[in-house]
């Protein structure tokens, strides 16, 4: 009964990990809002068009939810983009875009939702990190920088708002079979000429468990961090990567 009628907000829940988490929480009984620029293929009364880099759109979306539900219990700041490029290959426009979406958009969302949870004296937040919170990867300096920032944002925010019974954790997936991964592979193939099947085989091969992860596996961990089952867990960088960063 823990999930029954809990109000959850997920950014970027039209596809990938966000969608898997949305479906899991709804199956558990939660009311889940999807804030995303990409419209779902199937009509969803809980879908709100939202560009996370625009503060006014975030504020309007959250206000709309509050007008109807009067509270927000759970937040998963999932929306983000990837960039496969060295520092020299990264344009200023690309830098501004990825920082705006991966970092500033998360800050804007927290800035709006945390006061709501503070007034409620309870809330659970999960931020989307990456295995690159822990390690560096080639051609990933700017993307890794944004995810490192999210890890620190989670830890400091957890400390600041623990007295208000608000928990903040950072989920840190490894390589997961999502549209984001497929776009990254497509870009790598176009850049290097490596056949796509070789790239996917290599991605499986470097994982201790011999395969990449599935969105549903990350969703299950996000649900755990959002739930009361993790009531003494806050400020954690929660790796779900098949053991990749242990190597």
Task: Mark where each language-model region is.
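Active-site loop immediately N-terminal to the catalytic Tyr-X3-Lys motif
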Residues: 88, 135-141, 163-164, 210, ...
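Conserved glycine-rich cofactor-binding loop
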Residues: 14-15
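Residue(s) in the substrate-gating loop at a strand-loop-helix junction
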Residues: 130
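Active-site helix of classical SDR
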Residues: 110, 146, 154
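Short C-terminal tail/terminal secondary-structure segment
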Residues: 135, 223, 234-247
